[in-house]
């Protein structure tokens, strides 16, 4: 980073501060992880200079024979990783991957179904604040108020009543197993498409420890970061050749222009890492760590939505403590723990305040932490939440979390 230090001291100083923050903070945001230096090197490479509109072998620019190699490697690795016949690695994000499916298969005004944002869904699944909710007629399904789990009977009833053209499964804040097969069966009853958004679960799916939607959903979308531990970006998978053609056209020229070849190369690196045996062991630990966090918090009398987790994340209902999600987020950050405020099912609080928090284990697992460290972290969270106005305790926890981070360092040898 000598060139940045020499030519742009403001950005250099920012990078130094952010690296320090990441090194010295317990990261529990479920959608974040710690990418390898190999991934970051590919993303920071000379490929950032190359325009390559189109697809390998069919570009609208010259000089693409080398970057074609990068994209082809990424495609083949993605197909192998998820056992899919077709893969599009060009989406700049998960949101753009999702919108490409809407663009490929639907017309404005068509009916779609997705999990309600307030019950753990995602903005792109039909939220009125998102283009998916502005352009389409949205019917939302929910989780059971009693169990906190998906109500498949409700889904089937709503599908038969409203006959949507697209059913979206997947979530941004749902910790349990998705029954992809059942949703696909329901979709078939009304000849609807089933799109699975496995953005949060992709790494677990790749490792074979969470059910794969690829054999059931017509289309599967995902991000390439989160549990997959790659660069920020999107990916689309399908086993249907006709749908693959429509998806490719929806991405380019329908939604995007030039693909980000440096990011695609970084995706290829991440997919290669995920194909290695140690990635499966990592994901097993991600799951074990999430379960340990949830169990320890529950032992400390915190309420876990749905009673636990089958994945890398879960929600904590803070109402019994009379603590708001935003207050918890802000105070825990002072204590050296970052996570995010999150609405819980049937939450009466505003989205800017919330009654819950979301906790995830991918980043701390990447550090090398295991169950004993999860107990320490969970006990620290309990201590802070039960003493939320006690500056002395917050300071003590911050010191403890810094020591824990130093025991499990990241990016050794990397200096800005």
UniProtKB/Swiss-Prot annotation:
Which keywords accompany this UniProt record?
Amino-acid biosynthesis, Cytoplasm, One-carbon metabolism, Pyridoxal phosphate, Transferase
Q: Which GO terms describe its biological process?
A: glycine biosynthetic process from serine; tetrahydrofolate interconversion
Listed PROSITE patterns: SHMT (PS00096)
What reaction does this catalyse? (6R)-5,10-methylene-5,6,7,8-tetrahydrofolate + glycine + H2O = (6S)-5,6,7,8-tetrahydrofolate + L-serine
Binding-site list for (6S)-5,6,7,8-tetrahydrofolate: 117, 121-123, 242
Offer an example of a GO molecular function term for this protein.
glycine hydroxymethyltransferase activity
| UniProt-listed Pfam families | SHMT
Q: Which GO terms describe its cellular component?
A: cytosol
InterPro entries the record matches? PyrdxlP-dep_Trfase (IPR015424), PyrdxlP-dep_Trfase_major (IPR015421), PyrdxlP-dep_Trfase_small (IPR015422), Ser_HO-MeTrfase (IPR001085), Ser_HO-MeTrfase-like (IPR049943), Ser_HO-MeTrfase_PLP_BS (IPR019798), SHMT-like_dom (IPR039429)
- Residues modified as N6-(pyridoxal phosphate)lysine are 226
From which domain of life does this come? Bacteria
Name where it's found. Answer: Cytoplasm
Q: Which family does it belong to?
A: Belongs to the SHMT family.
The record's note on quaternary structure and interaction partners says: Homodimer.
Against PANTHER family, the record matches this protein to:
SERINE HYDROXYMETHYLTRANSFERASE (PTHR11680), SERINE HYDROXYMETHYLTRANSFERASE 1 (PTHR11680:SF35)
Q: What is this protein called?
A: Serine hydroxymethyltransferase
């Amino acid at each position: 980073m000598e060139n940045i230090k020499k030519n742009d001291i403001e950005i250099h100083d920012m990078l130094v501060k952010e690296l320090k923050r990441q090194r010295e903070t317990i990261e529990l945001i479920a959608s974040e992880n710690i990418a390898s230096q190999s991934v970051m090197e590919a993303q920071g490479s000379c490929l950032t200079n190359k325009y390559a509109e189109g697809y390998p072998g069919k570009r609208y620019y010259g000089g693409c024979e080398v970057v074609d190699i990068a994209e082809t490697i990424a495609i083949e690795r993605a197909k192998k990783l998820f056992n899919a016949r077709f893969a599009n690695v060009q989406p700049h994000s998960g949101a753009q991957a999702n919108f490409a499916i809407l663009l490929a298969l639907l017309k404005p005004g068509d009916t779609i179904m997705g999990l309600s944002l307030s019950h753990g869904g995602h903005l792109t699944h039909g939220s009125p604040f998102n283009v998916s909710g502005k352009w389409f007629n949205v019917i939302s399904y929910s989780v059971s108020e009693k169990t906190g789990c998906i109500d498949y009977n409700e889904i089937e009833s709503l599908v038969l009543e409203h006959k949507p053209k697209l059913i979206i499964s997947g979530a941004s804040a749902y910790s349990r197993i998705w029954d992809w097969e059942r949703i696909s069966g329901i979709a078939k009853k009304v000849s609807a498409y089933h799109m699975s958004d496995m953005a949060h679960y992709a790494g677990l799916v790749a490792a074979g420890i969470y059910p794969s939607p690829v054999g059931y959903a017509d289309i599967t979308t995902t991000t390439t970061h989160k549990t997959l531990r790659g660069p920020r970006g999107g990916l689309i998978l399908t086993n249907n050749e006709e749908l693959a053609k429509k998806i490719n056209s929806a991405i380019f020229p329908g939604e995007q222009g030039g693909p980000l070849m440096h990011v695609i190369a970084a995706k290829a690196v991440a997919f290669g890492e995920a194909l290695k045996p140690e990635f499966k062991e990592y994901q097993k630990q991600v799951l074990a760590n999430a379960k340990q966090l949830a169990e320890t918090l529950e032992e400390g009398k915190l309420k876990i939505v749905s009673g636990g987790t089958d994945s890398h994340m879960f929600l904590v209902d803070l109402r019994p403590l009379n603590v708001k999600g935003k207050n918890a987020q802000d105070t825990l950050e002072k204590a050296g723990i970052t996570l995010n405020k999150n609405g819980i099912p049937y939450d009466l609080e505003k989205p800017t305040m919330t009654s819950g928090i979301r906790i995830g284990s991918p980043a701390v697992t990447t550090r090398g932490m295991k169950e004993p460290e999860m107990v320490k972290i969970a006990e620290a969270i309990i201590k802070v939440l039960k003493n939320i106005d006690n500056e002395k305790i917050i300071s003590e926890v911050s010191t403890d979390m810094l020591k824990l981070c130093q025991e499990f360092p990241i990016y050794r040898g990397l200096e800005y």
